[in-house]
């Protein structure tokens, strides 16, 4: 059975909601899913005064456990078109796994959130893809078979690079992920799980010396 990690960082709960949808989609495809988050770097007093969503129930992941999964789906909000520092700090600690090729051949995928429609969704996902490529992972996005990313009747996240959500409306008020955005996240989770399962099946028919 395919083992998937949905690894996320969420300040205000938008990515947390998307992460849960990704996990649910993967479970629909028969994957065993762990939903975990990376450590917070912001001091608790500052996070509390800034309205961060504290006490999220997902446990904290360890770097070493990344090698235990067949697929890793990362969720991070944007920070000026790049992943959040909390996620970058975590991934910067994977040097040991990189040196031993522990993540080579594993499926990787990314989803994100931004505060505006053009706030860096695609660049955030692509910058995270770069890390995955250095680790030898096989990248999977959100294919156009998810028709929700083609909608023109509403402002919505989602692109072929990955699911996404907008965290604010046009009046800069907090906005929860829409039904369409959550559908995209579930689709991505299911798609990643299916690709990872197919890769597992394919490897089972290879000669051992040809695997990775």
Swiss-Prot record:
Residues 161-182 are annotated as: Disordered. Residues 4-192 form the Flavodoxin-like domain. It comes from the Bacteria. FMN binds at residues 10-15, 78-80, 113-119, 134. Binds 1 FMN per monomer. Its cofactor is FMN. It is an enzyme of class 1 (oxidoreductase). Substrate binds at residue 98. GO terms for molecular function: flavin adenine dinucleotide binding; FMN binding; NAD binding; NADH:ubiquinone reductase (non-electrogenic) activity; NADP binding; NADPH dehydrogenase (quinone) activity. One of its GO terms (cellular component) is membrane. It holds the Pfam family FMN_red. NAD(+) binds at residue 12. The keyword NADP applies. HAMAP family: NQOR. This is NAD(P)H dehydrogenase (quinone) 3. It comes from Rhizobium meliloti (strain 1021).
């Amino acid at each position: 059975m395919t083992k998937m990690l949905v690894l996320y960082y969420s300040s205000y709960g938008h990515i947390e909601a998307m992460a849960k949808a990704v996990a649910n989609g993967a479970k629909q495809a028969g994957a065993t899913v762990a939903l975990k988050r990376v450590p917070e770097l912001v001091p608790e007093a500052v996070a509390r005064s800034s309205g961060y969503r504290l006490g999220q129930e997902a446990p904290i992941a360890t770097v070493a456990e990344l090698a235990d999964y067949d697929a890793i789906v990362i969720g991070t909000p944007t920070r000026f078109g790049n992943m959040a520092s909390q996620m970058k700090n975590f991934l910067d600690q994977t040097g040991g796994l990189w040196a031993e090729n522990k993540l080579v051949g594993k499926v990787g995928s990314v989803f994100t959130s931004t505060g505006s429609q053009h706030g860096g969704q695609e660049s955030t996902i692509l910058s995270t893809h770069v890390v995955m490529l250095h680790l030898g992972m096989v990248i999977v996005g959100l294919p156009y078979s998810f028709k929700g990313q083609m909608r023109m009747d509403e402002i919505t996240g989602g692109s072929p690079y990955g699911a996404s959500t907008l965290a604010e409306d046009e009046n800069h008020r907090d906005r929860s992920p829409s039904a369409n955005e959550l559908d995209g996240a579930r689709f991505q989770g299911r798609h990643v799980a299916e690709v990872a399962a197919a890769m597992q099946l394919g490897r089972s028919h290879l000669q051992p010396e040809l695997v990775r």
